[in-house]
């Protein structure tokens, strides 16, 4: 039976305009009551687990610690979808969501009024992925500035008053693993290396996130 998912965290944890970095995802699953953490990516085996593997000196296992880390490193998090429909409550794939209501106003206001210089997208350019919806809704010509080797593009100064670095992550979701194994150039270039690990794709994601979130290694008072 079709269900309407309304985002549980966007308005509770809105982006802080003094922060320097913004993480943008899509939307949580319809059912959130079973989340380990009542927050963005609070379900098992998600974004925070990848960051925990990449930065074991931090604690991404509980809400209080995650909020402390985000605050300490001047990082906000939000999602691009405020509401959407699904054919049933078990649907989690982004490409199967429909009747989307986007969080464009909050994100646009944040970028216009903040000091954010880096955006991280937790999914790429497939149907209803975070980077795809963001660039389409905010009319960002990412193709002109896309560096496929680095998985990054820039938003020029003319759009939000300053140049913004945009980093397109590989989705932390296990549903993305098949696509990574079959078509992610960064993974395929080192496929033989990753074969030695129990979970090659997870190891790849951990190393990719470690490279892109290098600032989490800095000592901050």
Where is each model-derived feature located?
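Short, hydrophobic/glycine-enriched beta-strand segments
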Residues: 16-27, 41
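Short, surface-exposed acidic-centric catalytic microdomains
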Residues: 31-98
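Internal catalytic-core helix/loop-beta-alpha segment
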Residues: 72-141
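Short amphipathic alpha-helices and their capping/turn segments at secondary-structure boundaries
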Residues: 7-16, 60-71, 110
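A general structural motif
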Residues: 17-19, 113-117, 163
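C-terminal capping/extension of enzyme domains
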Residues: 1-12, 18, 43, 90-104, ...
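Short hydrophobic segments within beta-strands
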Residues: 23-25, 121-122, 169
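Short catalytic/ligand-binding loop motif for oxyanion handling, primarily in non-cytosolic enzymes
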Residues: 30-34, 85-88, 126-132, 174-180
